[in-house]
A protein has these predicted regions:
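Conserved active-site and cofactor/substrate-binding residues in soluble primary-metabolism enzymes
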Residues: 34, 38, 44, 54, ...
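Short, well-ordered beta-strand core segments
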Residues: 47-49, 69, 147, 186, ...
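Class I S-adenosyl-L-methionine
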Residues: 2-4, 10-32, 37-134, 139, ...
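Short, charged beta->alpha transition segments
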Residues: 57, 86-93, 143-147, 172-176, ...
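Signature of uroporphyrinogen-III synthase
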Residues: 16, 30, 76, 82-86, ...
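Conserved anion/nucleotide-ligand pocket segment
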Residues: 167-214
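Class I SAM-dependent methyltransferase SAM-binding "motif I" and its flanking Rossmann-like core
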Residues: 107-182, 227, 377-383, 443
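A short alpha->loop->secondary-structure connector
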Residues: 122-126, 148-150, 204-210, 345-353, ...
């Protein structure tokens, strides 16, 4: 058994001297939360990950950093890699002894050409496994509030493709008469471009022209759009609205239930696109909160955490821990980095000495509490002035003539140590990390920003703003896309103003919760 970098057990890796294995994994319909646990575990162990156009790009971050990522997208006649070449590539990578994950939208065996790929692997003697995924044929209707079966309406449903093999010409393997006469719901995949012909065939074969029709575009994602009409009107509506693929079409009386059962598109941030610029490991925290509320989240980390350039102060601080009366942590990164160094030299938390601990913000406090450390002081306002005020107003604690260790970023505002010194403290400002530029875009979020813009760009620190500006040009990005800026607090706002940007909103309180509340309020 091998444990991957996320701590997951990878039972299926094989020694590199032997042939590898190919996993045909269903990525689900688009919502990353609908990926199966088995699928997530396999992505986390992949040496090679080949993914389709309809796979949510955010799933790529589950792969090891060392994994080879191959885009194998197919849209109509535009294939990044022709199917035959892709089949051979899967065989080749497996024969190199690699663990290969072929990530396919929906389910591999539901109009996903997974059968063809599995046949090729079987003929080549390459071990393979099929990992089913949730098909858009049921998931997209569900997210639109349309049940494909309902005791009061129908007890069956039929799924067909609206895009048969081109070489069939006008020939069709679909029995349209039987389909039209059946009482069940009709679900059509890949049928947007041919919706007029599909509707005409159903009507020609006796299906009532007033039969309700629903079309769900980008189902289960925050880009979801739903169009409803009847067999007689749907094709004209598609043309009028410019409704494009990918979409699932549902034909039947159950479509009328959408008016009562719609839920996904009613979430408070639905339809808003929000850019999150935190570090790659932290972006998911804010991103997940926003996604749950319906936002289309683009995770574009602009910084990553690295060791401080000069570690002498850190070494001295660790060796002199027993001399401090207070340890002050201003961010979750500060906690993580400090204790990473601490546990390299000490085995026992009691080696911190008899100090008290101050934490700035609930996220910082949560990191410390996870280590079973008591927070002695946490200011109501998460700023330098707030920390100083908390000490100044405290009836229990005085820091006059006390030694205070301040563990934070290498580049940080001098205001906090100055405020603490004004209260008589002897302050050691100890850098435990630095922020450096992050330029990698594994999930395609930068391209999506360029193509479709954003409603909001969020900044959680001065460094995220400065590095975003250095990489993209903040003012130019805002002017191009008409986006608004959300700042977590005063220090970040100061940095933004220096860059020529006035935030539309500053979070109150200055925390992730405050940022979420601010976006909710702005959405109305």
């Amino acid at each position: 058994m091998i444990i991957d970098r996320a701590g997951r057990a990878c039972f299926n890796r094989r020694p590199m001297a032997t042939i590898g294995c190919v996993y045909l994994v269903g990525a689900g319909p688009g919502d990353p939360g609908l990926l199966t646990r088995r699928g997530a575990d396999l992505i986390g162990c992949a040496d090679v990950l080949a993914y389709d156009a309809l796979c949510n790009p955010s799933l790529l971050k589950l792969a090891p950093e060392s994994a080879e990522i191959i885009y194998a997208g197919k849209r109509a006649a535009d294939h990044a890699i022709p199917q035959g070449e892709l089949n051979q590539l899967l065989v080749q990578k497996a024969c190199e002894g690699k663990t290969v994950v072929r990530l396919k939208g929906g389910d591999p065996f539901v109009f996903g050409r997974g059968g063809e790929e599995a046949e090729e692997l079987a003929e080549a003697g390459v071990p393979f496994e099929i990992v089913p995924g949730i098909s858009s044929s049921v998931a997209a209707p569900a997210y639109a509030g349309i049940p494909v079966t309902h005791r009061d309406h129908c007890s069956s449903y039929t799924v067909i493709t609206g895009h048969e093999r081109p070489e069939k010409g006008n020939e069709s393997s679909i029995n349209w008469k039987q389909l039209a006469e059946s009482d069940g719901t009709k679900v059509i995949l890949m049928g947007v471009e041919r919706i007029r012909g599909i509707a005409e065939r159903l009507m020609e074969n006796g299906l009532d022209v007033e039969t309700p029709v629903g079309m769900v575009r980008w189902g289960t994602t925050c880009r979801q759009e739903t169009l409803t009409g009847t067999l007689e009107t749907i094709a004209d509506l598609v043309e009028q609205k410019g409704f494009k693929a990918p979409a699932v079409t549902i034909v039947g009386g159950v479509v009328d239930l959408r008016e009562q059962l719609s839920w996904f598109e009613r979430r408070p941030l639905f339809g808003r696109r929000v850019v999150v610029t935190r570090t790659r490991t932290q972006a998911s925290v804010l991103g997940a909160r926003l996604s749950e509320l319906g936002a289309d989240v683009l995770e574009i980390p602009t910084i990553k955490i690295a060791e401080p350039e000069d570690q002498e102060a850190l070494r001295d601080g660790l060796l002199g821990l027993g001399s401090y009366q207070w340890l002050v942590f201003t961010s979750p990164n500060g906690v993580d980095c400090f204790f990473n160094y601490f546990f390299k030299g000490f085995d026992d938390l009691r080696d911190l000495g008899g100090c008290r601990i101050a934490a700035v913000g609930p996220a910082t406090a949560a990191k410390l509490k996870a280590l079973h450390l008591k927070i002695d002081l946490m200011p109501d306002c998460y700023t330098a002035e707030g920390v100083a005020a908390a000490f100044r107003d405290s009836e229990e604690y005085s820091i006059e003539n006390e030694n205070v260790a301040l563990f934070r970023a290498q580049v940080a505002s001098p205001e906090l140590p100055r405020e603490l010194e004004s209260l008589g403290a002897i302050v050691d400002d100890i850098p435990v990390y630095q922020t450096v530029s992050e330029t990698e875009d594994r999930n395609g979020a930068v391209a999506r920003l360029e193509e479709g813009g954003a409603d909001w760009i969020t900044f959680t620190s001065s460094s995220t703003a400065e590095h975003f500006d250095a990489r993209f040009g903040l003012v130019a990005t805002l002017e191009k896309h008409g986006a608004r800026v959300l700042s977590i607090g005063p220090e970040t706002t100061k940095a933004l103003k220096k860059l020529g940007v006035e935030p539309a909103v500053e979070a109150q309180p200055h925390s992730i919760d405050g940022m979420v509340e601010a976006l909710m309020a702005a959405a109305g």
